[in-house]
Amino acid sequence: MGISRDHWHKRRATGGKRAPIRKKRKYELGRPAANTKLGPQRIHLVRSRGGNTKYRALRLDTGNFSWGSECSTRKSRIIDVVYNASNNELVRTKTLVKNAIVVVDATPFRQWYESHYLLPLGRKKGAKLTEAEDAIINKKRSQKTAKKYLARQRLSKVESALEEQFHTGRLLACVASRPGQCGRADGYILEGKELEFYLRKIKSKRAK
């Protein structure tokens, strides 16, 4: 039997059975879930109603993540799935779905921050910079350019919880796209109250 999105197979509110009024129709069809896993990218194309195409992601390992407070978006590697409000099984099997909480690589965001503000981020005190990083941060600049960066640095504050994550090189993010429909796992970096909430949830889950 095919997956059907009809409602006449359900019982009445009184508990009585309904007689089937017709056979299944094409416009009532449903498809099996994509259950997108972490791994080298694999996307299938699915023809849908009206000749449109859906991008069924079966495996993904990267996504575009937005750092809201800095208005910056970077492509980053997805490392792990750590929390899912709807189902713990989806965490165990590392399934990427909308609103899954994932761990992403912090490097692209750190590189952007350091080149934008010319300030180190998420580094131990006294840690040596590589030649390339040193060339970006300590490069000799004109007076006008230096003034521009000084003005930026006044607004360069990063909240402590996020800075701690930069020290570990991993950031918590939330998937905002639907990988089984659009073939992408894009989302945003968790900040503020939302970050606090999910850190609490993850901590209590580990304590069990």
From Swiss-Prot:
GO terms for biological process: ribosomal small subunit biogenesis; translation. GO terms for cellular component: cytoplasm; membrane; nucleolus; ribosome; small-subunit processome. PROSITE patterns: RIBOSOMAL_S8E (PS01193). InterPro entries: Ribosomal_eS8 (IPR001047), Ribosomal_eS8_CS (IPR018283), Ribosomal_protein_eS8_euk (IPR042563), Ribosomal_Se8/biogenesis_NSA2 (IPR022309). Keywords: Cytoplasm, Lipoprotein, Membrane, Nucleus, Ribonucleoprotein, Ribosomal protein. It is a lipid-anchor. Residues 1-34 are annotated as: Disordered. CDD domains: Ribosomal_S8e_like. GO terms for molecular function: structural constituent of ribosome. Residues 7-26 have a biased composition (Basic residues). It is found in: Cytoplasm; Membrane; Nucleus, Nucleolus. Component of the small ribosomal subunit. The ribosome is a large ribonucleoprotein complex responsible for the synthesis of proteins in the cell. Part of the small subunit (SSU) processome, first precursor of the small eukaryotic ribosomal subunit. During the assembly of the SSU processome in the nucleolus, many ribosome biogenesis factors, an RNA chaperone and ribosomal proteins associate with the nascent pre-rRNA and work in concert to generate RNA folding, modifications, rearrangements and cleavage as well as targeted degradation of pre-ribosomal RNA by the RNA exosome. Component of the small ribosomal subunit. Identified in a IGF2BP1-dependent mRNP granule complex containing untranslated mRNAs. Part of the small subunit (SSU) processome, composed of more than 70 proteins and the RNA chaperone small nucleolar RNA (snoRNA) U3. Belongs to the eukaryotic ribosomal protein eS8 family. NCBIfam families: eS8. This is Small ribosomal subunit protein eS8. The lineage of its organism: Eukaryota, Metazoa, Ecdysozoa, Arthropoda, Hexapoda.
